[in-house]
Each structure stands twice: as C-alpha cells, then as structure tokens.
Amino acid sequence: MPTPENLATDATVAIMLADGFEEVEALAVADVLYRAGVRADLISVTDARHVTSSHGIRVVADLMLEDVDLSAYTLLFLPGGMPGTLGLKATPAIQTEVLRRADAGQPVAAICAAPSILAELGVLEGRHATANPAFVKAIAAGGAIVHENPVVVDEFIITSRGAGTSLELGLEIVRYLLGAEVVDEVARGVVLAR
C-alpha cells in the first residue's frame, strides 16, 4: 500500500496474503491502518504478487514474502478465509515468525480461521482469544480461553471473529499501536457507531 500522507508513526504492519484469503478481513484492516497513518504492506506468500481471495477477487500485493524481513514489522497480521488460512499455515516463514514473536512478546493479530494457526503452534495456550465460530473448537483444543467478543486482546496477541468484525479489529490494532484518541478519530471517519 502507499505510505499514508498522514504518517503518524514508525510502526508498520505486515498483512499476509495467501490464495483464498478473506478480502474484507485483509482490506478493511488495511484501510483502517491507512486512515490512522500506519504503514501496512500487503505481502504475498504465493509465487506471484497477484493473490486471489476466497471469493475470486484478485489483489496485487505490495511485496513478496521472499523480499521482506517479517521481524522488521511492528505487527504481523494473519487474515482468515479458506483456503487462505491453510496457505498461511503451510508457510514455514509464517510459522517461524509467529513463534519468534510469541517468544519475544511482539504483536500478532489473527482473524476468523487464522487464530487456529496460533493455536496449533501453541501460542494461545492459557490465553484469552476468539475466532470464527467454526474454529472455536480448534483454538480451545490449543488451550485458548475462548470468548465470543468481536475482538480479544491478551497482551500482544489480538484475535477477532470474522469479516463482520474486521473494522473493530483494525481499530484495536490502531489502539495497540497509537492509543485510544486515534481510534476515536478513525471510527468517526469511517462512520462506525461505538
């Protein structure tokens, strides 16, 4: 994505895209971050910059996974969608980075089916989390304390339920990175009742 003209922070977000990603989840969060002045890069884990969503919409990623250092980003974001979540889960660099961040206490956000990746890696053990209702059993099996809230924050792990909670997830990431005042401003800008 282009760098926001109102760049408000040095914080950066890596938005990971595999074929079959959920476009509302990925792009609504990207939009909220842009409005808040946070640079977010759409990063393809496929062998091409064109990535196709779970509903057949083609998106051009900013960067290829092979060309970035994920550890240089402030926050790693895993959108859901099927089979996109499976594509992210099958990407060794994603697994490695999620585990590194968990060990270092660095932020990871995941929505819909993607929290199941965190659960399978053991990152949600004893942590409060949420996911799409179809994946609640998977995160519970991974030791998560499951909630039905739209967004759940447990220290540096941020999880959300699905496409309908994407704006709220984006705002929670903004809160994590920039604070509540910016959240209120962005929420007003997207006419989100709070």
Pin down the residues of each PLM region.
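Extended, subdomain-level signal for the structured scaffold at the beginning of enzyme domains
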Residues: 1-108, 116-120, 125-126, 138-148, ...
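Catalytic, metal-anchored helix/loop core of enzyme active sites in primary metabolism
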Residues: 112
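Anionic-ligand binding patches
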Residues: 129
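Short, acidic/turn-prone active-site loops that include or flank metal/cofactor-
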Residues: 133-136
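Cytochrome P450 catalytic-domain "roof"
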Residues: 153
